[in-house]
Swiss-Prot record:
Transmembrane segments: none annotated. The lineage of its organism: Bacteria, Pseudomonadati, Pseudomonadota, Alphaproteobacteria, Rickettsiales. F-type ATPases have 2 components, CF(1) - the catalytic core - and CF(0) - the membrane proton channel. CF(1) has five subunits: alpha(3), beta(3), gamma(1), delta(1), epsilon(1). CF(0) has three main subunits: a, b and c. It holds the Pfam family ATP-synt. One of its GO terms (cellular component) is proton-transporting ATP synthase complex. GO terms for molecular function: ATP binding; proton-transporting ATP synthase activity, rotational mechanism. This is ATP synthase gamma chain. Belongs to the ATPase gamma chain family. It comes from the Bacteria. Produces ATP from ADP in the presence of a proton gradient across the membrane. The gamma chain is believed to be important in regulating ATPase activity and the flow of protons through the CF(0) complex.
Amino acid sequence: MSHLKQLRTRIKSVKSTQKITKAMQLVSASKMAKIKSQIAKSNFYIEAISKMMSDIVSIDMYELSIEEQKFFNTIPNKATLLIVMTSQRGLCGTFNYSIIKQVKYDIKELENKGEQIKLIIIGKKGYEALKMQYASYIDSYFELPKIHAENLILQVKQKIMSLVANLEVSNCVIYFNKFKNAMTQIMTRQQVLPVEKYHDDSKIENDHYEYEGKNLISNLINLYVSSQINYALLQSRASEEGARMTAMENATNNANDLISKLVLKLNRSRQAIITTELIEIIAGSEAV
């Protein structure tokens, strides 16, 4: 009988866990849908800013100041800044693994070339994975807020602008998971600075810009860096929720399979006990 009690307790426990994983799956699905909507709304703005910045360099429309040139040219013997975007929480499958693996590989490559490295890590999981081995490279660590990320974007942007302006870094690369669908996230390594040029003049021949104002280019640089961080953050968050939704769906299905096996085991155990009792009763009656 104690064995039956253990099985019932186990079934109850698994059912309780299944309710939690199902709830987490639904929450992640809801969050993912909201973030996908934000991505759709922001894509045009982000692409427009990126193209405008590239066009400035490609067609040489504006004579850049010394300070502005730092954001458009690679400066020799300066550190490479790696911005690593991971999740704050776990239970999202292999979401963080591919990012960490690529970052470690790139760090090794940069070390072999004798280049300096600085890290900005966004998200607790990335920090925990890299802090022991690369503590000397970490310049800044930012936790991901639960809801609004405006302050985070501002802080990261200010840090990047400061490092470039002070000639501490030249190249700036951001690592994040790009959202494809709930089951697929693409590990992405994207250059932020220096701003890349268009090589196909046909793409820009019909675009005509007139740049006026003392601080226009500086303001565009600020908008561009912010937009790149925002883009990566939205993609990463959508990917995280998609990965978590898929992981929780798998956990829910696994729990359902385990419950079925435990119920079958319980029924067989009960049947065995009943059969044993019947045999004892029959044997007793025959003895009488």
